[in-house]
């Protein structure tokens, strides 16, 4: 822009001079400058820019803009660029439609961008001043707009470009190898031509691309479904999604990833969810039945991509789980073993917990569905609370199960999961109390620690009110041990004899234990009765004012029994009932572990050889139901426990049947435990009805107590609100029906704890 002129003086006198810009410019001068610039622009477009002085061109453009001829320069530029693109570039591209189209277009695009960068540099001052003042497109963008409108969006070029790109992608989807670079270049060009927006790319490529893809995937889904199992279909869809993502990454603009994936998801998953899930011999149920955790995980991952996908899976899983659960708890198997019943439910829960962890990502929806399903079918069977208590009873009893304390702990934790699903927790509590009492009183608990651990679990779950009675039972046992130590010391000190009876008495607090209000009668034999009377006198002397009532149904005894050998057969051989050959007429001694009722019956046979059912009933005064059960255990049990024989030899016990001691009785064991018939099967129907009646009576009191508590604090309440509040308070123990609550409210009104308001009969007030 400047030149140095030679001076005659010393070096100091040499000065740099800037050539002055003309003050005014006539039209002729302006035209000559424009011609110079126009020629330069055309040379740049023809790639003949090596001879141009960019410095001079910049100065000329600067001069034009400075003297207010920016518009002429801007308009002229637009015309020159437009002319070149129409006459030269567009023609070249049109000529290449059937031969190297994308390469030609890409070359033209690259040349145009290079030219526009040079032109922009020359006209930089116009960009800074004229463009800013007049709010028009800058030089480079102007070039892009003209290229877009005159070349890329020119009728047949636009159509051909779109079709070429779509064809190449369609071919690649079918497995052909295509020029990915050419696709990428074209897509980048369309994005740049949108001038920082994506409208050109979207309209000229993306929208038709998505439309074509939808049609393609629609057809592909039909083909995939017809030819593949659910698991293979899922893998193919997964592969298709990954392929589309990879194509976007290498060929298209990143912004296309989301919409194309949505198209794949809609066409290959959303539209066929039910079909995939319900596929026969390969769908969700097939996977659940056969424990295919990996296939389920793939299905979960795929379905989690689409709206309602997991809901569809959940619904199908739920109907299968409910079907399985209902089969387990169905009433059909009346002789169902409670331990097997609960174990079946625990196994089912374990299976679905595994699916939840390994396949369903511990998803909340699946978790809630599984919990809801278990709650649904567990409560279909009214025996579930009793059976759960019997299951826990089985695990907490001493026995040859070979379980470590840790294994027992794990089983109890699983049982607690079922307990949480149980609506009638008060029924469970009643049975648990019975079974715990039996374990404690027969010294059958595997360990005190395990028992207390279980009570602590129940306490955590339901609060101390739920377990206070159970804890009271343990306190009674501890106090009883101390009392028995004191009693034995008293016997030693006084020299009183119990007549050969080794007596252990457990003194139980009535409110804690499942004692019976009307204690079953029983004429205890003289020897144990005498021993107990000595204890009674000792105890009441220490605790005046207390009353001791024998609970025969909860007691047990160890009897020394002598059997006098088998009967000789006609051939002279001797055989015992158990099938073991016995020689000689040697007697066999056993200790029989029996209930108080069984002891009372067996001790009769010290006096006489035979008794009829009626005679036993008369002598013992045992209630008929208890007597039948005791005799069945003694005379109709396993051969290794059959210490009595009866005539006739039927399973039933009826009046007129005759009982004798079975002198052929043999057992490999010295101590023989006489099992109570059907003890593991839970209660009989009459017993169950009785328990249910007791539960209902307890519930009446609990419901009334809750109503009074609520009304005392709220003073006045509308009927429906009170019912809802009572239900909320009691649901941790049982679900009271609104009808029962209404009856209890009416009972309280009759007893004047509550009153109806005169203005509204459905509103109650608390009567202090």
Curated annotation (Swiss-Prot):
Stretches assigned to the Cullin neddylation domain: 698-760
Gene Ontology biological process terms from the UniProt entry: anaphase-promoting complex-dependent catabolic process; cell migration; cell morphogenesis; cell projection organization; cellular response to amino acid stimulus; cellular response to oxidative stress; COPII vesicle coating; embryonic cleavage
Phosphoserine found at: 585
Post-translational modifications: Neddylated. Attachment of NEDD8 is required for the E3 ubiquitin-protein ligase activity of the BCR complex. Deneddylated via its interaction with the COP9 signalosome (CSN) complex.
UniProt feature, compositional bias: Basic and acidic residues: 682-698
One Pfam family recorded for the sequence: Cullin
Example of a GO cellular component annotation carried by this entry: sperm flagellum
Interaction with KLHL18 as annotated region, ranges: 2-41
Positions bearing the Glycyl lysine isopeptide (Lys-Gly) (interchain with G-Cter in NEDD8) cross-link: 712
Function comment: Core component of multiple cullin-RING-based BCR (BTB-CUL3-RBX1) E3 ubiquitin-protein ligase complexes which mediate the ubiquitination and subsequent proteasomal degradation of target proteins. BCR complexes and ARIH1 collaborate in tandem to mediate ubiquitination of target proteins. As a scaffold protein may contribute to catalysis through positioning of the substrate and the ubiquitin-conjugating enzyme.
Identification of the protein by name: Cullin-3
Gene: Cul3
């Amino acid at each position: 822009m400047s030149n140095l002129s030679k001076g005659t003086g010393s070096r100091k006198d040499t000065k740099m001079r800037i050539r002055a810009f003309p003050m005014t410019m006539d039209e002729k001068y302006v035209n000559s400058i424009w011609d110079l610039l126009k020629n330069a622009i055309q040379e740049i477009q023809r790639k003949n820019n090596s001879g141009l002085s960019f410095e001079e061109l910049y100065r000329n453009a600067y001069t034009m803009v400075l003297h207010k001829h920016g518009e002429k320069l801007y308009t002229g530029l637009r015309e020159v660029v437009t002319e070149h693109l129409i006459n030269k570039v567009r023609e070249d591209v049109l000529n290449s439609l059937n031969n190297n189209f994308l390469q030609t277009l890409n070359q033209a695009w690259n040349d145009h961008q290079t030219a526009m960068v040079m032109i922009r540099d020359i006209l930089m001052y116009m960009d800074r001043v004229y463009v800013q003042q007049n709010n028009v497109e800058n030089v480079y963008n102007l070039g892009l707009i003209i290229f877009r409108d005159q070349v890329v969006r020119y009728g047949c070029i636009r159509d051909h470009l779109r079709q070429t790109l779509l064809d190449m992608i369609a071919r690649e989807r079918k497995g052909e190898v295509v020029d990915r670079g050419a696709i990428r270049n074209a897509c980048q060009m369309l994005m740049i031509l949108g001038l920082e927006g994506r409208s050109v790319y979207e309209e000229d490529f993306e929208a038709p691309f998505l439309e074509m893809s939808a049609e393609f995937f629609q057809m592909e889904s039909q083909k995939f479904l017809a030819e593949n199992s659910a698991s293979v279909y899922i893998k193919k869809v997964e592969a298709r999604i990954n392929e589309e993502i990879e194509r976007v990454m290498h060929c298209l603009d990143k912004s296309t990833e989301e919409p194309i994936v949505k198209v794949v998801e809609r066409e290959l998953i959303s539209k066929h969810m039910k079909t995939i899930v319900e596929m026969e011999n390969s769908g969700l149920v097939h996977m659940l039945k056969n424990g295919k955790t990996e296939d389920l995980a793939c299905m979960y991952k795929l379905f989690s991509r689409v709206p309602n996908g997991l809901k569809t899976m959940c619904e199908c899983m739920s109907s299968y789980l409910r079907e399985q659960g209902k089969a387990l708890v169905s009433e059909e198997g009346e002789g169902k073993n409670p331990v097997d019943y609960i174990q079946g439910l625990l196994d089912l829960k374990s299976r679905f917990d595994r699916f939840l962890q390994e396949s369903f990502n511990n998803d909340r929806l699946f978790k809630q569905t599984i919990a809801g399903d278990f709650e649904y079918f567990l409560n279909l069977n009214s025996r579930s609370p009793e059976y759960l208590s019997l299951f826990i009873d089985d695990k907490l009893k001493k026995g040859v199960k070979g379980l470590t304390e840790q294994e027992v702990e794990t089983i109890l934790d699983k049982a607690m999961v079922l307990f949480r699903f149980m609506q009638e927790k008060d029924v469970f509590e009643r049975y648990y109390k019975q079974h715990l009492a039996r374990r404690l009183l027969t010294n059958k608990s595997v360990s005190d620690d395990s028992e207390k651990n279980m009570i602590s679990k129940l306490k955590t779950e339901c609060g101390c009110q739920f377990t206070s009675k159970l804890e009271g039972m343990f306190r009674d046992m501890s106090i009883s041990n101390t009392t028995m130590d004191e009693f034995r010391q008293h016997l030693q000190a006084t020299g009183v004899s119990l007549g050969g009876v080794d007596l252990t008495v457990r003194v139980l607090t009535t409110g804690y234990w499942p004692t019976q209000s009307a204690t079953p009668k029983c004429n205890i034999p003289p020897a144990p009765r005498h021993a107990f009377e000595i204890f009674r006198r000792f105890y009441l002397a220490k605790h005046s004012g207390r009353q001791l009532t024998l609970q025969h149904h909860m007691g047990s005894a160890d009897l020394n029994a002598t059997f006098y050998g088998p009967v000789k057969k006609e051939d002279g051989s001797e055989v015992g009932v158990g099938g073991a050959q016995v020689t000689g007429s040697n007697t066999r001694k056993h200790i029989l572990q029996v209930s108080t009722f069984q002891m009372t019956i067996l001790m009769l046979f010290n006096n006489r050889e035979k008794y009829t059912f009626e005679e036993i009933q008369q002598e013992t005064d045992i209630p008929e139901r208890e007597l039948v059960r005791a005799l069945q255990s003694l005379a109709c049990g396993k051969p290794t426990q059959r210490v009595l024989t009866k005539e006739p030899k039927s399973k039933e016990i009826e009046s007129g049947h005759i009982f004798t001691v079975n002198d052929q009785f043999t057992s490999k064991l010295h101590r023989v435990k006489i099992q109570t018939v059907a003890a593991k099967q839970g209660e009989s129907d009459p017993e169950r009805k009785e328990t249910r009646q007791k539960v209902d009576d307890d519930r009446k009191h609990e419901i009334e107590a809750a109503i009074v508590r609520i009304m005392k604090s709220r003073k006045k309440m509308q009927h429906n609100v009170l019912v809802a509040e009572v239900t909320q308070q009691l649901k941790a123990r049982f679900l009271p029906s609104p009808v029962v609550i209404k009856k209890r409210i009416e009972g309280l009104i009759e007893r004047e704890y509550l009153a109806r308001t005169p203005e509204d009969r459905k509103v109650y007030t608390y009567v202090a």
